[in-house]
Swiss-Prot record:
GO CC, alphabetical: nucleolus
A Pfam short name: Brix
Name of the featured protein: Ribosome production factor 2 homolog
Naturally occurring in which organism (per UniProt): Oryza sativa subsp. japonica
Biased composition (Basic residues): 295-310
Subcellular location: Nucleus, Nucleolus
UniProt key word Nucleus: yes
């Protein structure tokens, strides 16, 4: 499937295309959540909880897709089409079969083409609804989570290093310069149990008094939690990776230009002192023409007085 290139015919359509255009500072990545040909009740709950955690920046399709085979040649075409259609650069695809039960594929795209993929199996899953806790501790919409990766396998095993990168990209959100302490209210704890298994749990942060300026932090499980068993991987091609890692040059700072919240953009213009005495005046100046006409009129009037004396 190839989406047709459309030329905007209105200002509204033009603004929508500009939102999707490359930017010097990119906005947060959107996530596309898809169902395969067959999904289990566990997998449906996993996809629903992931959408709940990323509902401010995610698109979820509930319709089953028969022609998506992410790891087969040509099977990723539909994924790339949906990525382009929804402007999503992160993909979560769930499927269930006898060979690969409760299968979850996490993927990233570059320029709406598959960049890399990691396939995991979901085991020992506990949904958000199965946890009982004070609802005041529920993570707020738009909050940024901490990540804690426990275990040496995240540094020594290539598959887990790849999974770590994808998980960080999946929940990173928008890039910000400063963080409000009240906005950091949750943490994902990922523990490498073995070279192929990662236990992942989602916890809320409860701040308590400690007698100092730094509060004491307690972890309260709010769900979901699951074991992720690593299966297949698709690493990025080296040439594509090099292209994706390129960074744009920042625009040069304009001299003598400032921004004001009231007046907007302000600039200083330096003009040299004008030497009026040295300015050359042309003969085509309207004021001079008027003076010539008046002088000629006075001259003719004086001649008439001499010819016809009273």
């Amino acid at each position: 499937m190839v989406a047709a290139i459309r030329v905007p015919r209105s200002q509204r359509a033009k603004r929508e295309l500009l939102k999707h255009a490359p930017k010097l500072v990119e906005t947060g990545k959107k996530t596309l959540i898809l169902h395969g040909t067959k999904t289990s009740a566990v997998l449906n709950s996993v996809l629903a909880d992931l959408f709940h955690l990323k509902r401010d920046n995610a698109v979820k399709y509930s319709k089953k897709n028969d022609n998506i085979r992410p790891f087969e040649s040509g099977g990723e075409t539909s994924l790339e089409f949906f990525s382009l259609k929804t402007d999503c650069s992160l993909i979560v695809y769930g499927s269930h079969s006898k060979k690969r039960p409760n299968n979850l594929v996490l993927g990233r795209t570059y320029d709406h083409h598959i960049y890399d993929l990691v396939e995991v199996g979901v085991e020992n899953y506990k949904s958000i609804e199965s946890y009982v806790y004070d609802k005041k501790l529920a993570p707020k919409l738009g909050s940024k989570p901490f990540f804690a990766f426990i275990g040496e396998h995240f540094e020594s095993v290539e598959e887990l290093k790849h999974l770590k990168e994808v998980l960080l990209d999946l929940f990173k959100g928008e890039v910000v310069e400063n963080l409000n302490l009240a906005g950091v209210d949750r943490v994902f704890v990922c523990t490498a149990i073995s070279p192929t298994t990662v236990y992942m749990m989602h916890c809320a942060l409860r701040l308590k008094r400690s007698g100092t300026s730094i509060p004491r932090i307690e972890l309260v499980e709010v769900g979901p939690s699951m074991d992720l068993v690593v299966r297949r991987h698709r690493y990025p091609v080296e040439s594509l990776k090099k292209e994706a890692m390129k960074t744009a040059d920042h625009a040069k700072k304009m001299k003598n230009v400032t921004k004001d919240p009231v007046h907007g953009k302000l600039g200083k213009v330096y003009i040299p002192d004008q030497q009026i005495a040295k300015m050359s005046l042309s003969n085509d100046v309207k004021g001079l023409k008027r003076e010539r006409r008046e002088a000629k009129k006075n001259k003719d009037h004086s001649k008439k007085q001499k010819i016809n004396p009273e």
